[in-house]
Amino acid sequence: MSSLYYANALFSKYPAASSVFATGAFPEQTSCAFASNPQRPGYGAGSGASFAASMQGLYPGGGGMAGQSAAGVYAAGYGLEPSSFNMHCAPFEQNLSGVCPGDSAKAAGAKEQRDSDLAAESNFRIYPWMRSSGTDRKRGRQTYTRYQTLELEKEFHYNRYLTRRRRIEIAHALCLTERQIKIWFQNRRMKWKKENKTSGPGTTGQDRAEAEEDEEE
């Protein structure tokens, strides 16, 4: 009995849900079709017309939004012509040349200098006497290794003049040419003469004859 009493008191305190919805707290039924409901303000059939009218007020240039392209909308809003969007590189380069005239002048000067250099090179002629031949070129000083110098000194100690056959053998053994061996022995003989100070007609004539014989061999 007591439990039934408390239940009736509780239900009497909170009215039924049907009465709450009927009184107008939630007068409309929940549905996803907002656009088809004529009683909902802002989503009715006339909302599109009011939105278009408001947009026409913002952009007094004319027509609805659906009929205008993006370029037309921006042109009407910011006072730009549609032809201003068709920009090419040529006017941009012309503007740059107008802003920086010094660069174009430098480029033109460099081109003229290059053309003049090419013309001068084409007109310049090299004659045969201007070219240095292989025999006229200055040869660098030959450097001998320590082993080569030691072997040549040994050979010079035993014989100051070499025959052609012996010169070829030494050249092959020391990886040198015959001319290099010959020049080394000539220089070594001159140094030996200065060191010993050999003077006298007999000795000089004998050395000269031996040198000529060495060159002929």
From Swiss-Prot:
Designated name of the protein: Homeobox protein Hox-B7
Motif (Antp-type hexapeptide): 126-131
Listed GO CC annotations: nucleus
Record's subcellular location: Nucleus
General function of this protein: Sequence-specific transcription factor which is part of a developmental regulatory system that provides cells with specific positional identities on the anterior-posterior axis.
Stretches the record annotates as Disordered: 193-217
Binding partners and assembly: Forms a DNA-binding heterodimer with transcription factor PBX1.
Taxonomic superkingdom: Eukaryota
Record-linked PROSITE patterns: ANTENNAPEDIA, HOMEOBOX_1, HOMEOBOX_2
Ranges of the DNA-binding region feature: 137-196
GO process terms (BP): anterior/posterior pattern specification; regulation of transcription by RNA polymerase II
Record-level Gene Ontology MF annotations: DNA-binding transcription factor activity, RNA polymerase II-specific; RNA polymerase II cis-regulatory region sequence-specific DNA binding
Entry keyword annotation includes Transmembrane: no
Assigned keywords, A-Z: Developmental protein, DNA-binding, Homeobox, Nucleus, Transcription, Transcription regulation
Family stated for the protein in its record: Belongs to the Antp homeobox family.
InterPro entries cross-referenced by the UniProt entry: Antp_homeobox, HD, HD_metazoa, Homeobox_antennapedia, Homeobox_Antennapedia_CS, Homeobox_CS, Homeodomain-like_sf
Species for this entry: Bos taurus (Bovine)
